[in-house]
Amino acid sequence: MNDATGTPQRILLLGGTSEIGLAIVRRVVRGRPAEVVLAARPSERRTAAATALTAEGHRVGEVDFEATAPATHPATIDAAFDGGDVDLAIVAFGVLGDQEAMLKDAAAAAELATVNYVAGVSVGLELAGRLRSQGHGAILALSTVAAERPRRSNFVYGSSKAGFDAFYSGLADELHGSGVHVSVIRPGFVRTRMTAGREEAPMTVEADDVAEVAVEALQRRKPVAWAPGPLRWVMAVLRHLPRPVFRRLPI
């Protein structure tokens, strides 16, 4: 259960090496010790993340998670819940991919869709069952503004995240009244390892900025939040542009 200040005491980060996910963990605990479970592939980055959180005073567990293998996800979630109830689950894994390469490699595009959408559905349903059974908890699902209207320049990625976004929005409705809350977070361009070397977009933000928005959404039980906030209005315009006009935009 959350502590007396409303801070989650046990957090599961699916995508345990995600810079945004780790920033959310640090922002939500606000310096208070917590138990954090990092679910990711075994790697030096996962070990480094666990070491850093331990040094900050948290109890840290590591669970192997392979997004491309949905059949393994029930066991992954079982392992994550072995230590007790989870107060907050952060779904923060995904891949951006190379659009030009995927146009020539359908298998690569299918793998991206598996990671960004199929795996999100798989772990989302597992989490929903567990959290509903315990009667409390929250899910923060890390989507993207690209999900709102996929662009020609990244429609493979955007379409996979559109499915992810729609699933968690629907899951929020499914869980309404169960004691479990779901917030979907839609960042724009974020400076992380995943976007390194790519041309930045207007209103680019840092991982900490997304974390601030995510924690506010969690605390206020917002169903959807944009990072930065003004992107909500930008996307409202883009969503309603006529297709011939949208197609000509240099985005």
Q: Residue locations for each model-derived region?
A:
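Conserved glycine-rich cofactor-binding loop
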Residues: 17-19
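Conserved glycine-rich Rossmann-like NAD(P)H-binding loop of the short-chain dehydrogenase/reductase
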Residues: 32-48
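Conserved mid-core segment of classical short-chain dehydrogenase/reductases
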Residues: 88, 94-110, 153
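Active-site helix of classical SDR
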Residues: 124, 160
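Residue(s) in the substrate-gating loop at a strand-loop-helix junction
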Residues: 144
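C-terminal helical subdomain
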Residues: 184, 199-236
